[in-house]
Amino acid sequence: MATFSEEQEALVNSSWEAFSQNIPQLSIIFYTSILEKAPEAKAMFSFLKDSDGVPKDNLDLEAHCEKVFELTRNSALQLRAKGKVEVERIALKFLGYVHAQRRVLDPHFLVLKEALLKTLKEAMGDKWSEEVSNAWGIAYDELAGVIKKGMS
């Protein structure tokens, strides 16, 4: 169980605001970063499978990116409020099933975390800090742990 401070929650919320201001551009940075580190991941995303590179103006891509960041932010809020991340049973089964079907492995979770942090750093510019990185990293790690449990 991770402890999450009020300051960490505030950092996640303020950086979420920076991210949500420019989802179309930041989603391209996010998926480009994923594919640079793990080109095989392209086949895991239906909206990337049949494209060369990362398509611009792709609503499915943008929605998925926003969902990843939103789930991670919600994990931070839960960590602060409850001391743990909880996902509804139906949602957990779905997340676990989808990730298992796509053959997501532990290294893929790490690649996604690195892409998430890189994207947030881009969104925040000079307001980025190690503290912001740590707060999002904790929230993401807890969420990934819950999804991995749902995969088994």
Curated annotation (Swiss-Prot):
Q: Keywords of this protein's UniProt record, alphabetized?
A: Heme, Iron, Metal-binding, Nitration, Nitrogen fixation, Oxygen transport, Phosphoprotein, Transport
Q: Which PROSITE patterns match?
A: GLOBIN (PS01033)
Recorded phenotype for the gene knockout or disruption = Smaller plants (shoots and roots), reduced number of leaves and nodules. Delayed growth associated with altered leaves metabolome linked to amino-acids processing, hormonal balance (increased accumulation of salicylic acid, but reduced methyl jasmonic acid levels), as well as fermentative and respiratory pathways.
- Summarize what the UniProt record says about post-translational modification: Nitrated in effective nodules and particularly in hypoxic conditions; this mechanism may play a protective role in the symbiosis by buffering toxic peroxynitrite NO(2)(-). Nitration level decrease during nodule senescence.
User: Could you tell me the superkingdom of the organism this chain comes from?
Assistant: Eukaryota
Which positions are annotated as binding O2?
64
What is its induction behaviour? Induced by polyamines (PA), abscisic acid (ABA) and gibberellic acid (GA), but repressed by ethylene and cytokinins (CK, an equimolar mixture of kinetin and 6-benzyl-aminopurine) in nodules. Induced by abscisic acid (ABA) in roots.
The UniProt entry, under Gene3D superfamilies, shows:
Globins (1.10.490.10)
Any one Pfam family match given in the protein's UniProt record, by short name? Globin
Where is the secretion signal located?
A: none
InterPro entries registered for this protein in UniProt: Globin (IPR000971), Globin-like_sf (IPR009050), Globin/Proto (IPR012292), Leghaemoglobin-like (IPR001032)
| GO process terms (BP) | response to abscisic acid; response to cytokinin; response to jasmonic acid; response to polyamine macromolecule
Q: Phosphoserine-modified residues are where?
A: 46
* Residues recorded with modification Nitrated tyrosine: 31, 140
Where along this sequence does the record place binding of heme b? 46, 67, 99, 102
Tissue expression as described in the entry: Mainly expressed in leaves and, at low levels, in roots of non-nodulated plants. However, accumulates also in nodules and roots, and, to a lower extent, in leaves, stems, flowers and fruits, in nodulated plants.
The Globin domain sits at 3-152
UniProt key word Phosphoprotein: yes
- What molecular functions are annotated in GO for this chain? heme binding; metal ion binding; oxygen binding; oxygen carrier activity
Subunit structure comment from the entry:
Monomer.
Q: What is the stated purpose of this protein?
A: Atypical leghemoglobin that reversibly binds oxygen O(2) through a pentacoordinated heme iron. In nodules, facilitates the diffusion of oxygen to the bacteroids while preventing the bacterial nitrogenase from being inactivated by buffering dioxygen, nitric oxide and carbon monoxide. This role is essential for symbiotic nitrogen fixation (SNF). Seems not restricted to symbiotic nitrogen fixation and root nodules formation, but also contributes to general plant development and metabolism.
Q: PANTHER family given for it?
A: LEGHEMOGLOBIN-RELATED, NON-SYMBIOTIC HEMOGLOBIN 2
Q: Which family does it belong to?
A: Belongs to the plant globin family.
Q: What is this protein called?
A: Atypical leghemoglobin 2-1
Q: What's the source species' lineage? A: Eukaryota, Viridiplantae, Streptophyta, Embryophyta, Tracheophyta
